[in-house]
């Protein structure tokens, strides 16, 4: 019997309703993926930072050295007197906030700075640490500083760990100075990363390794370390 005849017999063996159901499920799945990709693209390309005039503490998400200067400017302008600084790659400028008396920016006088290495080494690890510290300190308004393409995903992750019942989350954005290629790379990575966000709805929920590796590969292509490749640099609170 020919292969074509075999396929025909298989098709005839499936009831019409089953074939219709499979087609409907496949169509709905495709529409769901298309909607999700469109929503993620909109969130990455059209963020809405809050720029609140004052927060109890500001979480400085690591992305590139410019974020440290932006954090110093916000603290110096009176937005906050407490910084949680994700600083695990140094020395790359974080010493302006986390260094000794001779290295620290003088504009941070009177500002409490807590530098930490997140676990895991992701935005998720950073917001977990900040949320824990907010609860320990009895604080209720958390600011989060990151670059524009990351604002809405950072908001979603932060609000999962520091819920509306516990307080408020406000986002700030800084100019990362990306060129066209850099914006494209971060945009594509941001859209892909929303897949992980949707698959891990819990605050500390992690993807299985087989699903995490594409995101790790994207990080490496952007020149960022992954997991244990990041050298932990932790400095305690300074004022």
Regions flagged by a language model, labelled:
Residues 32-35, 174, 178, 217:
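Aromatic-anchored segments of alpha-helical transmembrane domains
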Residues 40-185:
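A structural signal for short, hydrophobic/glycine-enriched beta-strand patches
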